[in-house]
Amino acid sequence: YDYNAKETYRAELGAIGGITDARSLAKLLTPLAQNNGELLSRNTVNELSKSNIKTPIDNMLLFPTNFSNGFMLNMDNRSKFEGEGGSFMIGHNAFGHVGYGGSSATFADPNTKVSFGYLTNKLGGEYLINERAQNLIDETYKCLK
């Protein structure tokens, strides 16, 4: 099955069918990163940073995961998972999500007031994000120090 085919893009697949650009993806989360109460109340945004599902081994992904309501939280599985793409390392109070096959990474970080969007042109073989995406996230945080 070719997830990069135009026919697949037109299929409107809910869980994996988001088609956008990186700037728009980051812009979507900007009000949450700024946490000014514009889109959601400050209390609701604060709740998005709190873990409510943390698994030692996720039944689908087969490695540890950490989720809030609707978002992924920091997941550093480098010492627990063999292979590339088993981690999503973001700030302590940041929340976001990755795309299927390592195709995207987005997060909002209310501590730094930064939103981040990254997209690839094609799907890869990673579970969460690819090394390039993680390097960009790491460099973003270094620039904020």
Predicted regions and their residues:
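Catalytic loop of the DD-peptidase/beta-lactamase superfamily, centered on the K-T-G motif
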Residues: 1-145
